Amino acid sequence: MPRKGPAPKRPLVNDPVYGSQLVTQLVNKVLLDGKKSLAERIVYGALEQAREKTGTDPVVTLKRAMDNVKPSLEVRSRRVGGATYQVPVEVRPDRSVTLALRWLVSFSKARREKTMIERLANEILDASNGLGAAVKRREDTHKMAEANRAFAHYRW
């Protein structure tokens, strides 16, 4: 355990194309092996494809997708006596954004389209329409929390 307390949050810069912190976070989630320019090419390509398919601002589409994917509840393991309970807890806003981006990117990688640009674009479009694997993951997370509601009094 560190004695100095939690590390300070580093400020995120807005991305140069759309001026959005959310796009910057998405680029950082797509990033592999430090290849930032490749990650930017993938994200900007996906957002451009989303613009072509919907005819609307891609950042608005991304925000709508994020609203459909962000979880409000999750379960955490809590050991009480000899048993481990799945205790439902509310998700902090910054964590919900992080989880939503993580799910969008991971389920994009699992899709069957040819390029990562197409996969990410289609996952974002599906999520903005309330479809797709990332939205299903959120629903499953909420179902788990609802099923374990009886253990909510073990919150810490």
From Swiss-Prot:
Gene3D superfamilies: Ribosomal protein S7 domain. SUPFAM superfamilies: Ribosomal protein S7. InterPro entries: Ribosomal_uS7, Ribosomal_uS7_bac/org-type, Ribosomal_uS7_CS, Ribosomal_uS7_dom, Ribosomal_uS7_dom_sf. One of its GO terms (cellular component) is small ribosomal subunit. GO terms for molecular function: rRNA binding; structural constituent of ribosome; tRNA binding. It holds the Pfam family Ribosomal_S7. Disulfide bonds: none annotated. Keywords: Ribonucleoprotein, Ribosomal protein, RNA-binding, rRNA-binding, tRNA-binding. The keyword rRNA-binding applies. The keyword DNA damage does not apply. GO terms for biological process: translation. CDD domains: uS7_Bacteria. Belongs to the universal ribosomal protein uS7 family. One of the primary rRNA binding proteins, it binds directly to 16S rRNA where it nucleates assembly of the head domain of the 30S subunit. Is located at the subunit interface close to the decoding center, probably blocks exit of the E-site tRNA. PANTHER family: RIBOSOMAL PROTEIN S7. Part of the 30S ribosomal subunit. Contacts proteins S9 and S11. This is Small ribosomal subunit protein uS7. It comes from Mycolicibacterium gilvum (strain PYR-GCK).
